[in-house]
Amino acid sequence: YVGKWFPPRKRVDYIVVLGSGLIDGKVPPLLAGRVDAALRYAARQKRKTGREPCLIMSGGQGADEPRPEAEAMREYAMEKGYPAELVLTETQSKNTKENFLYSKRVAEAHSEGKPYCCIYATSDYHLLRAGLYAGRAGFSCDGVGGRTAGYYLPNALLREYIAYVVMNKKRYLTIAAVVFALSLTLWGGLALLAWFARML
């Protein structure tokens, strides 16, 4: 939630908007919150600098979706009045990691190899894990979060926690192994002390 309350203040060239599931081929409230967060940042930047960033809508087509998420997101942003020429799409990704990998390619191709600055927009509960994936993809950018409806938040946080554990499973397995080994050592030491006590 840090990115929600303390959004980046720098001027950016690109905002990567992370996709999520469509409903009947349309942008549902959860995904709309992500696009709206990007639009708010872009509007604030335009007021301050007179320059609007490009939006990179990132999301492929799920097995149960009639079209790529990025296309629906682009349509939504344009309906909100954002210039069509400033809305790019990335339609190959299937998960957050791929969102950043493929969006980075889009930004690099569009910028023609010139240095650029970017941020990403996602749901507020998703900011931390998304930022970790951005770093792993070599995509250095901060994040801004869209509001998540209260009724959906408990489920979202639980899913996010599980995904975070899976993402860092090697670290957690190592910690679990160390704790288990220490527990066995402690138990063995106590058992040995108890044996000596009985022998006295």
Range-by-range predicted roles:
Residues 187-200:
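Juxtamembrane boundary at the C-terminal end of a transmembrane helix
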Residues 163-179:
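Juxtamembrane/start-of-transmembrane alpha-helix segments at the extracytoplasmic/lumenal side
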Residues 177-189:
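Hydrophobic core of alpha-helical transmembrane segments in multi-pass integral membrane proteins
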Residues 152-167:
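Accessory recognition modules or surfaces
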Residues 1-156:
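A structural signal for short, hydrophobic/glycine-enriched beta-strand patches
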